[in-house]
Amino acid sequence: MSLLIDFIDETEEVKDEYISLIRGLVEKAAQMENIEEGAELSVTFVDNERIREINRDYRDKDQPTDVISFAMEEMGEGEMEIVGAEMPRMLGDLIISIPRAKEQAEEYGHSFDRELGFLALHGFLHLLGYDHMTEEDEKEMFGRQKEILEAFGLGR
């Protein structure tokens, strides 16, 4: 199984091991979710100020957050479905705040690797259509997160 993942580091703080961790975890999730070969996504690493701007501009929340997902397959109001040639499946974009991930790892008392992996997986599942707006959806999404993290070796 192989996804095409474009990593963009706006912080200049991201080590190769972080990219390897996220690539491996997202590949494992894609395998467990039966995502086809060649599907694409991007992962951008930003600081708290940048994610606050994105959160404000796209979600009307003027505060930093840990991860934001932009699913390409989610149809917005008034958007037309694109039907065309055999193109790779574009899942969407993940934006992860590195400083927020560090803060939360400390706050929750676990490693930065686990927090970064959790955030990447959480965002990835949103790209696949999972959500936690209702209690039932939350139970399904968080249960799936736990299964994948444990299968990858990042369980609690």
Swiss-Prot record:
The keyword Cytoplasm applies. GO terms for biological process: rRNA processing. GO terms for cellular component: cytoplasm. It holds the Pfam family YbeY. InterPro entries: MetalPrtase_cat_dom_sf_prd (IPR023091), YbeY (IPR002036), YbeY_CS (IPR020549). Binds 1 zinc ion. One of its GO terms (molecular function) is RNA endonuclease activity. Its EC number is 3.1.-.-. Its main location: cytoplasm. Keywords: Cytoplasm, Endonuclease, Hydrolase, Metal-binding, Nuclease, Ribosome biogenesis, rRNA processing, Zinc. Zn(2+) binds at residues 122, 126, 132. It is found in: Cytoplasm. The keyword Nuclease applies. Single strand-specific metallo-endoribonuclease involved in late-stage 70S ribosome quality control and in maturation of the 3' terminus of the 16S rRNA. Belongs to the endoribonuclease YbeY family. This is Endoribonuclease YbeY. The lineage of its organism: Bacteria, Bacillati, Bacillota, Bacilli, Bacillales.
